[in-house]
Every structure is written in C-alpha cells, then in structure tokens.
Amino acid sequence: MEKEKDSKLKQAMKGLDSFLTTHYSFRYNQITEQCEFHDKHKFDKYRVVDEREFNTLVINAIEEGVNCMDRDMRRYLGSSRIPSFHPVTAYLEHLPHWDGHDRVSELARSVSDETQWVEVFHIWMLGMVMQWSGKNRMHGNCLIPILVNPLQGLKKSTFCRSLLPPALRGYYTDDFDVTREGDALRKMRSLALINIDEFNRMEEGKLARLKNLVQMSGLSMRRPFQSSYSQQPRLSSFIGTSHFCDLLTDSSGNRRFYPVMTKGSIRLPRINYKQLYAQLRDELKHNRRYWLSPKEEQAVSLRNDAFLRRPIEESLFYSCFSLPRDEEKFQRWTIGQIYEVMKKASPETMRDVKMRAFGKHLALMGVKKLHTRYGDQYLLNRL
C-alpha cells in the first residue's frame, strides 16, 4: 500500500515537473526571496507567483491532466529545483565590453562642474557597484553624496532615481527611516539605492545613527520565522537631496557626506546604462580605487565646514561669553558651568540642547579647551 502511494506521488511530481518546465520558466529572486515565472509561449515578463498566480498554475496543471494538489505545487516551487537569480549581479554579469568613453564624469557634470565633486562622484559610483557585486565584505560604501539647492523642481530626486537602469528601478526607494532599525536593515539588504530625501530634516541623533549604518558591510538580522540572527550581505548605497545648505551637525565626523550645490535644473544626458555600468565594472576589474584616501577624506571634511548646521544656541553663547584673543587673560569653565549660565539667561533656548551635543557645539564655535585631571576646562571670558 505504501509502495503504491509512493509510486503515485512520484508520478504526480514527474507529471507536474514535465508540465511546468514545458510551459513556464521559473526563478527564485534572491533579493525579494520570491518565486517568479513567465509563460514560455507568451514571451511575457517575469512576475511573482502570488496567491492568485499560484492558484492559476494549479488549475492549469489539473486541466492538463496532471494529478496534483496545492501542496505538490507549493513543494515544487519552494524547492531547489527552481534556479536562484540575483537581479543586480545578473545585470552586471551580462554587460557588454566598455567602449572607453567616460560616461561617469559626464553624468557628474550634469549636477556640478566642481572638479572635486566629479572625482568623488566617480568614487562613489564605483563603491556602489562594488557593493552590488558582494565582493567587498570588509567595508560598506560609506560615502553619501547630497544634492543641494534651495529651489524646488530642479530634478534632484529625478537624478537620484535615474542612476539606476530601468531593469533595477524597482530596487530604489526614497522612504527610509533610521529609527526603525529592523525596517532599515531589511531595506539595506534588499535595495540597490536609497535616497534620503530632504536630508536637512534629519536630527543630530538620526545623523549619528545613519553614519553607523552606512559603514556596515554586513547586516546582523533575524529573518522572518527564525529565532536566531544571521549575517546578511548589504546591497544598498545611499544618496540624498536637500533644500538647505546647513545640514551637517558634527564638524569632526562629516567625511561620510559630500553635499554639492547643483548648478540649477539638472539636465540629465541621455544615459547609455549598459555602457555606464560596463565602465564601472571594467574600472573595478582593473583595481581602480572605490574609496576615499585619507588625504581625500581630509579635503572633504574641510570643504564640508560650509555645510555645517550652526547651533541654535550660538547667538546666546556670544551674548554670555567671549573667546580670548592671543595672550589675553582667560577664565576656565567646565561645560556644566557654561551650560548653567546660558540656561539661566534663556531657558527656552537651552531647553532642547542636550549636554552631549552641547560639547560638540562648543567645538564647532571654536572654543578651546584644556584636558586636566578634573576633566575638560574651556577657555572663555564672561561678559
């Protein structure tokens, strides 16, 4: 009886396999973790086997005389019989030979003619493609270009979206919240490019969290229906847009960002995506550098001072204290003493200024300090 049952099951699976491979092509999308298919006779695009399509496949199989049930179809589609497919790496693997024309610099100049920007954008694009390839397991693409202009309608977001070829446009988003860690990590695993729109709205704490995220090469995540965490590869790179110039908060740690003023409405060249990405692929094959050197990081950090967000308490500070000039006498103040003086002068201004951030703000305002056994002491004069 058992042998007869096994024989019927084998026949059913054999019939199902014959029917499906004759009429359809299947693939398992490693990014979305979904089974996709297309009809061989209709030459249509691949689409997800959702519940509706699944039921249609079962009905079609039964109508063709295949003795199968839902569980048989589910077992088949959930097996390794379905070949794996990674849309991003597959795109890179099927690119033509590069014709030698520098399309990356051409694309960068549609935003700005600044020489440093053109070089940094090129490095960032190389980093993005290296991130996609999965070969850089030690470091993530930790640079974020930010397109800046106070005017709206200049196609900043359009430029960001247009960096991806049409075949990969579904792996782009401008919806990203660093405070929702689980969702943020999932998007970093499954999206090719994340645009942080209106970057200037990010609070100081969120910027610090973003800097941590952007340096990750791997992601420690708990997958659906699993109790333990596992290491997942990161796919995404980041870009941003802003209406305001004062968008950075930390003068000592802004080398991860590259704000650039657009020269007006961005006029995108007609992009030959296959040649654009063939250039990047070939440059990486020839070991072109896809990260900033220490000297370049220092230069980026210096130029970014122009994009620093001034502390809200800066005017209050200068109404209470002055910075001593060379050889001028000074007083030593602890950060707590400075904070209390300013809080007494304007409680409303200091209400949202956290002590940890206040220390960074003092450094940003150029306040010198001494390291003593009693802690840091700031050199100031009381007005």
Predicted feature residues:
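AAA+/SF3 P-loop NTPase mechanochemical coupling elements
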Residues: 184-189, 223-241
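P-loop NTPase catalytic core of nucleic-acid-dependent motor ATPases
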Residues: 79-189
